[in-house]
């Protein structure tokens, strides 16, 4: 009787994927359209901007707070369930505060504090299920990107056919569905900590690898600031139509999905360090090419294909490295730091800095992004050595 040479353990693929799908579906519903809803209530651009800024502050604080709570709790998943239920219930307050600006802002931000702040903690649940098969992470995480894309498209269709007034009902429904998805998942017992990750006397803050990872991933997210904040405007100034702009964004999302799907193949053959270095240098090339090929749709399309590298590959490697570099007692804080400092702080700072350079020269803002990404690559190459990263720096034996 024949058996698989390397049978893969059973992983609750669809239950895990469902959480990522609905987390990103909530984002895909709120990010593009919540300002339109606020405008329909009669609020000014300044007021909607205030709400956006406060939500960004929330994404900087909430992950670390929840990381501390989860690391101290007996069950990480129970905290995730409770937090997501709280997010859904708090969001219901929005319906009572349409005409009360600050109460509305408080309800939206408090809800976001719960569900967005817990995203990093579910990464640990997923990685614990994967165990010795972290290469399978991408095929679970890709459903998050698919959820975001689906929500953006479907919500836009609903708003066009009916009214933006339906938006809070859609968000509330998605939040409750997200909570239900956490109920069908289960905790996975944590495996014994490898010798290479023994808890250090000084705790998480005395870990030099953690500090290096924070710097590298902060910089690469910082380099995305001009892209996330000004890419559409950049294309418009180059005379590219809105339809073509939408197509270019779609190419990037498609590349993101594809890269998540094929990451297991790469991770079977290359070390995380090698994947990271290649991704960082290609990210720098992407931003440099974007500035140099402004107005050339064919070249810009090819460059958008690199989004799978600059986002999907980088994110996958980051999640795994932040887990591997700390003791299990600090996993929640490590993932929270990545989410808050690198993603939240890096992108926010990148948008702000990119805006300042944009005022001088739009093209220069992308050259600046290229320099930042190249700097991240050089730091990773020089200081995140194979010996320092341990198993993550060596070729995978999967």
Task: Please describe what each predicted stretch is.
Residues 21, 90, 101-119, 218, ...:
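Hydrophobic core of transmembrane alpha-helices in multi-pass small-molecule transporters
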Residues 2-10, 185-217:
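Juxtamembrane intracellular "pre-TM" segments in multi-pass secondary transporters
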Residues 6-56, 209-217, 221-248:
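Helix-loop boundary and gating motifs at the non-cytosolic
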Residues 166-183, 365-383:
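Symmetry-related core transmembrane helices of the 12-TM Major Facilitator Superfamily/SLC fold
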Residues 78-92, 274-289:
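Structural signature of the two symmetry-related core transmembrane helices
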Residues 61-75, 159-160, 259-272, 358:
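Helix-to-loop junctions at the C-terminal end of transmembrane segments
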Residues 61-98:
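Conserved MFS/SLC helix-loop-helix module at the cytosolic interface between two early adjacent transmembrane helices
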Residues 108-143:
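Cytoplasmic helix-loop-helix junction between adjacent transmembrane helices
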């Amino acid at each position: 009787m024949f058996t698989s040479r390397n049978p893969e353990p059973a992983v609750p693929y669809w239950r895990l994927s469902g959480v990522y799908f609905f987390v990103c579906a909530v984002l895909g519903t709120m990010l593009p359209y919540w300002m339109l809803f606020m405008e329909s209530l009669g609020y000014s651009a300044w007021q909607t901007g205030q709400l956006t800024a406060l939500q960004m502050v929330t994404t900087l604080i909430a992950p670390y707070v929840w990381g501390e709570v989860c690391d101290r709790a007996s069950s990480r998943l129970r905290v995730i369930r409770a937090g997501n239920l709280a997010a859904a219930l708090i969001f219901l307050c929005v319906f009572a505060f349409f005409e009360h600006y600050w109460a509305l802002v408080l309800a939206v931000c408090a809800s976001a504090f719960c569900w967005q702040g817990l995203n990093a903690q579910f990464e640990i649940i997923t990685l614990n299920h994967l165990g010795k098969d972290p290469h399978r992470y991408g095929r679970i995480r890709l459903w998050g990107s698919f959820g975001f894309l689906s929500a953006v498209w479907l919500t836009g269709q609903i708003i066009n056919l009916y009214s933006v007034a339906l938006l809070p009902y859609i968000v509330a429904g998605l939040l409750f569905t997200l909570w239900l998805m956490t109920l069908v998942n289960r905790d996975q017992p944590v495996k014994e900590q490898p010798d290479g990750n023994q808890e250090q006397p000084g705790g998480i803050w005395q870990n030099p690898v953690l500090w290096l990872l924070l710097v590298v991933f902060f910089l690469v997210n910082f380099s995305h600031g001009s892209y996330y904040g000004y890419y559409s405007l950049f294309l418009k100034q180059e005379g590219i139509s809105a339809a073509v702009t939408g197509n270019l964004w779609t190419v990037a999302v498609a590349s993101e999905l594809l890269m998540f799907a094929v990451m297991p193949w790469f991770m079977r053959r290359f070390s995380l360090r090698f994947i990271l270095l290649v991704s960082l240098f290609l990210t720098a090339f992407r931003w440099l090419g974007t500035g140099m090929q402004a107005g050339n749709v064919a070249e810009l399309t090819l460059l958008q294909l690199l989004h799978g590298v600059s986002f999907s590959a980088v994110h996958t490697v980051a999640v795994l490295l932040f887990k591997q570099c700390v003791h299990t007692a600090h996993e929640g804080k490590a993932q929270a730091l990545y989410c808050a400092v690198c993603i939240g702080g890096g992108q926010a700072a990148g948008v702000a800095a990119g805006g300042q350079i944009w005022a001088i020269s739009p093209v220069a803002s992308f050259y600046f992004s290229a320099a930042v990404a190249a700097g991240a690559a050089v730091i990773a190459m020089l200081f995140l050595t194979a010996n320092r990263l341990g198993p993550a720096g060596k070729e995978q034996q999967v």
